Swiss-Prot record:
It catalyses: (4R,5S)-dethiobiotin + (sulfur carrier)-SH + 2 reduced [2Fe-2S]-[ferredoxin] + 2 S-adenosyl-L-methionine = (sulfur carrier)-H + biotin + 2 5'-deoxyadenosine + 2 L-methionine + 2 oxidized [2Fe-2S]-[ferredoxin]. Catalyzes the conversion of dethiobiotin (DTB) to biotin by the insertion of a sulfur atom into dethiobiotin via a radical-based mechanism. Residues 46-274 form the Radical SAM core domain. Binds 1 [4Fe-4S] cluster. The cluster is coordinated with 3 cysteines and an exchangeable S-adenosyl-L-methionine. Binds 1 [2Fe-2S] cluster. The cluster is coordinated with 3 cysteines and 1 arginine. This is Biotin synthase. Keywords: 2Fe-2S, 4Fe-4S, Biotin biosynthesis, Iron, Iron-sulfur, Metal-binding, S-adenosyl-L-methionine, Transferase.
Length: 335
């Protein structure tokens, strides 16, 4: 909550309302940054989790998400790829581990998981990643209770299923899946004992109120999502949002800081669109509460800062991270 002096009281809550969140989101930036740092220092160390993201199956998704080049409704020219073999994925995971990745995230461009050979291969991949001593995360659309249970049995650490935007703005972004579908998927994941990875995207044409509404839904989940990816739109030619303007970096800093205040213990992951942020803006995001990044030259179908530039940045900032990332020279992009 906010006291009479406009200070945020650092406590873990699950009953934030939109009015309170807007007050935080709209605080003078210097005050917002100060308050978020207080919360971040109380609940977390300045340790950055390094996550590697690999597209196991690219393109051909049946959903019509207007920001996504992997949708069958998109006119984007992307290089589609059928599902990689288990051995190929685990070889990538092993390289990621040697590079210092703490978590290996695997993405499938699917509307939903379907039982059969592909799902069985996914289970093998999850088990294989865990056998390497890494956290395993999957993002593959909707799933059933039984599928969630089987993923849990395979050792899945986290399942990513983003809300994208507010309930009010959602219908302007996607119509092939409802907001409730997303919430139901998250519930099944949680009921199976798998950590929830859930966040959103800014720059979709939403208002500040929409951003507060998205954060309200996330911060009222009990427990809070284990990790919260905050993405900024990467406008891709051929998608429905190709003409959207880039967001100002201050908007990302505000979103990161507010998310940290609302969800003190969650990993706040600075995700897609990070390449557009200056070094200084990224440093402010880390200062305000971001404590996880995706590293590697590409995130599914969008670009990302280079391995070398990230390593240099983290060393300059003075945060702690896996030391293998500091010494390894080989990168996934070199394969």
């Amino acid at each position: 909550m906010i006291n009479s002096n406009n200070q945020v009281l650092s406590e873990i809550r699950f009953d934030w309302n939109k009015k309170e969140i807007l007050e935080i989101l709209n605080m003078p930036l210097i005050d917002l940054m100060w308050e978020s740092q207080i919360v971040h220092r109380k609940f977390n160390s300045y340790n950055i989790q390094l996550a590697s993201l690999f597209s196991v199956k690219t393109g051909g998704c049946e959903e019509n998400c207007s920001y996504c080049s992997q949708s069958i409704y998109s006119a984007s020219e992307i290089k589609s790829h059928p599902q990689f073999q288990v051995e190929e994925v685990l070889a990538r995971a092993k390289i990621a581990k040697n590079e210092g990745a703490d978590r290996f995230c695997m993405g499938w461009a699917w509307r939903e998981i379907r039982d059969g050979k592909s799902f069985n291969a996914m289970l093998e991949m999850v088990s294989g990643v865990r056998d390497l001593g890494m956290e395993a995360c999957v993002t593959a659309g909707m799933l059933t209770e039984e599928q969630a249970s089987r993923l849990a049995d395979a050792g899945l650490t986290a399942y990513n299923h983003n809300l994208d935007t507010s309930p009010e703005h959602y219908k302007n972004i996607i119509t092939t899946r409802t907001y409730q579908d997303r919430l139901d998927t998250i519930k099944r994941v949680r009921n199976a004992g798998i950590n929830v990875c859930c966040g959103g995207i800014i720059g979709l044409g939403e208002t500040n109120g929409d951003r507060a509404s998205l954060l309200e839904v996330l911060s009222n989940m009990n427990p809070h999502p284990e990790s919260v990816p905050i993405n900024s739109l990467v406008a891709i030619e051929g998608t429905g949002l190709e003409d959207n303007q880039e967001i100002d970096s201050i908007e990302m800093i505000r979103m990161i800081a507010t998310a940290r205040i609302l969800m003190p213990k969650s990993k706040i992951r600075l995700s897609a669109g990070r390449e557009k942020l200056s070094k200084e803006a990224q440093i402010l995001c880390f200062q305000c509460g971001a404590n996880s990044i995706f590293y590697g030259d590409e995130l599914l179908t969008t670009s990302n800062p280079s391995f070398q530039s990230d390593r240099k940045l983290l060393k300059e900032v003075g945060v702690s991270f896996n030391k293998d990332f500091e010494t390894c020279e080989k990168t996934l992009s070199s394969l």
